[in-house]
């Protein structure tokens, strides 16, 4: 998952840029704790959003609550799929088969179609489940696999990031960033 850059399908994904300010982790346990913390804080923001409002768009280019969750489900699902496919000896297509990193509008629309009909509760439960799968997977990785580049073919793109960075940008970073987006949505839509 990339840090959301909007719907411009020609945007360069955030993972293609060097980011010296990206959080780092001492070990897998620290990354797992960060995932749980960021996810809990993100999902807490949905507690007072009514199911009837999940498709309400606050601003023309903004995301609805359902789209925010679909985006998260899509990218965490892709991360898990990349690993599953590689471990099964299959060719992994990143970001997704038929798409390139400079054209992410298609996958986003697929995420919205695939997950947009879920209730907010169902989407949150599914996201918790996928995050738990990611954490379980992280516990199986050696320090070398997690922190050194070139440990997976799916991670060997132009960025040459180690797995931990891919996990961070598909979990902690968007959970944190989109929490702010949901708060802004609520300020514009929820009234006392």
Language-model regions, residue ranges each:
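Short linear/disordered segments characteristic of secreted peptide precursors
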Residues: 9-10
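Short, helix-capping/interhelical loops that line the mouth of catalytic, cofactor-
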Residues: 13-30, 78-129, 189-192
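Alpha-helical bundle segments that constitute or directly flank the non-heme di-iron/ferroxidase center
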Residues: 24-53, 74-84, 169, 173-176
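A non-catalytic, amphipathic alpha-helix used as a structural packing/dimerization or gating element
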Residues: 34-41, 122-136, 173
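Short, contiguous alpha-helical
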Residues: 55-106, 146-192
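Proline-centered turn/helix-capping motifs that create local helix->coil transitions or kinks
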Residues: 139-147
């Amino acid at each position: 998952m990339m840090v959301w850059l909007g719907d411009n399908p020609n945007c360069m994904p955030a993972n293609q840029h060097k980011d010296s300010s990206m959080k780092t982790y001492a070990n897998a346990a620290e990354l797992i704790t960060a995932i749980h913390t960021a996810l809990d804080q993100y999902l807490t923001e949905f507690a007072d959003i009514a199911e009837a409002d999940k498709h309400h768009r606050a601003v023309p280019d903004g995301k609805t609550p359902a789209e925010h969750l679909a985006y998260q489900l899509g990218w965490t699902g892709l991360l898990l799929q990349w690993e599953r496919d590689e471990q099964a000896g299959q060719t992994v297509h990143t970001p997704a088969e038929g798409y390139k990193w400079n054209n992410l509008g298609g996958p986003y629309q697929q995420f919205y179609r695939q997950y947009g009909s879920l209730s907010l509760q169902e989407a949150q439960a599914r996201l918790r489940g996928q995050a738990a799968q990611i954490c379980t997977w992280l516990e199986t990785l050696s320090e070398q696999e997690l922190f050194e580049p070139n440990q997976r073919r799916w991670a060997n793109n132009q960025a040459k990031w180690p797995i931990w960075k891919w996990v961070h940008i598909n979990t902690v970073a968007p959970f944190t960033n989109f929490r702010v987006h949901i708060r802004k949505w609520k300020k514009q839509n929820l009234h006392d």
